[in-house]
Amino acid sequence: MKYPILLALLMAATVAQAASSQEYVFKDQPFESGSLSTDGKEFSISTVSSRGNLCDLGGRLKNNIYRDDEGCEIHFAFSGNKVRVTTPETAREACSKYCGFNAYFTDDYYRLPAACTETAAKNSEQRFQTAYRAKQYTQAAQIKQQYLNACNSFMFITEQMRARNDLAVAYKNSGNKTACRAALQPLRRHWSDKAEHHSYVYRDAFMKELAAAKFNWNACR
């Protein structure tokens, strides 16, 4: 995926992990981001809250538990494509030192689908742009729709908005105004949002995509 700045910061912490590590991320949390990388022996976690505050931690696991020397204890429960990260109540204060104000890392993390990796997303975008520039608008819309169907739950809000705007324009140019409006419908809940409602971290990009969505909606009526 094309991550915004805060996601780029988040992912940078996991670059040093071994190639065999699995990558897990937050799901259905479009205003927050979280990344867990682990090979079962070591782990690295980075999260960014909706206000731009971070958690950053890592270490060695023993029986799927991490303990530092200062009372922090973290449990990892692996189940299929999901990892649940928890801390005992008695360890929460000690673990809070890894996070900024109101940031957290205890949550469910989901394995990122193959279609949603950065490489796959770049390939999908290239195919979309190639089809769009060739005026193959129906094909371009199909490519973008498939990507959204697979990856929407794992995308940051501004990514979702950008992808839906691209999809809407492709549908409009293909002559399918009904599908154009359907692509934008999930964004209409934000129609009345003001800049001050959102964090400085993504505010400018959010308002830019919101303005584009409103313009595209009117163009598809």
Outline where the language-model segments fall.
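Tryptophan-anchored aromatic micro-motifs
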Residues: 19-32, 61, 68, 105-111, ...
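N-terminal glycine/threonine-rich, aromatic-flanked beta-hairpin/loop signature
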Residues: 25-63, 90, 141-155
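Edge beta-strand at a domain terminus
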Residues: 56-63, 91-124
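Alpha-helical segment of the N-proximal tetratricopeptide repeat
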Residues: 117-154
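Hydrophobic/aromatic side-chain positions at a characteristic register within alpha-helices
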Residues: 132, 172-175
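Alpha-helical junction/boundary sensor with strong preference for TPR arrays
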Residues: 144, 150-152, 190-194, 198
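TPR/TPR-like alpha-solenoid helical repeat scaffolds
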Residues: 158-169, 193-221
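TPR/TPR-like (Sel1-like) alpha-helical repeat modules
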Residues: 177-195
